[in-house]
Structure formats: structure tokens, C-alpha cells
Amino acid sequence: MSMCLAILYFLSSQASAIMVGLSTEELTKASEVVIRGEVEDVEPHWSMDGKTIFTSASITVKDVIKGKISQKKIVVEYEGGEIGDIGVRVSDVSPLKKGENIILFLKSGESKRDKQNEKIHNIVGSAQGKYTIGTDGIARKSGFSIIKGQEAIDNDISVDPLCL
């Protein structure tokens, strides 16, 4: 009996890491804001309850593709990161790296830190909502597993038509 429960737990936790693929159109519709920017800094921190690690990334906004953002710098927060010898990796989350040029599909969120009233953004669709812009001008996304909808996903998109 306990072996069956262990197997069911394992299967359910594995299944939760697989998502349905989202097209660029679906990501755009689900997002309040879509931006092109550069990652200025990343800072891991403990959640308020001290049970998990989240990372806050400071992003300099270069272009607003959809929506309105009045500030030139925003904070994007996502689960995972490393503090000292402790690290948390989350399946289907593509960590942001300092100096990275990116396109992000975002929605407003609440910070997991103690800072009250800090306005943060979360990435829509986990890793699907992050494109890394290469030196060739192509924005690429990776780092996620999908159960269905592969045909809908645009893994590579040209940046120029987006930033008119």
C-alpha cells in the first residue's frame, strides 16, 4: 500500500512539471505587459515563510511592446535560486542572468519578500514567457517541457517586427 502511494506521489509531482505549450499570441493575450530589456542584477532571497528561495531580477526596460510601464527599471520575481550552500531549481523556470538581453511576457504580482508594497512582475507561462535575444537579432526560448501544444510554440522570433 505505501509503495503504491509513493508511486502515485512521484507520478503526480512529475506530471505537474509538464505544461501545455503557448503560442506567442496566447502569451501576449495573457500578459499585461510585454517588454524588451536587459537584466541588470539578480538577487536570491528567502520567502517570507522561510520555506523556499525566490529570485528578484532588476530589469532595465528598453522597449515596451504591449501595455504601459512608466518606470525604466522593473523587478521580475520567480521561484528558485541559490543562497549560500542551498539551492532551489524549479522545473520549467528559465533563470534570468545578469547582462542578458530579453523579451518578457509579464503580469503584476506580489513579492514573496518582506518588502511590503513592492511592485513586482511575474513571467507568464514560466519559461515560455522568456525569450533571450541573440547577437543575430533572433529571440529564442528554451528550458521547458510541454505535454501538448508543441505546434503552437514559436521558439525563435525576430525582434525587429516586435519593437516597432
Short names for language-model regions:
Residues S2-C4, L8-L164:
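Transition segments tied to proteolytic processing and entry into folded domains
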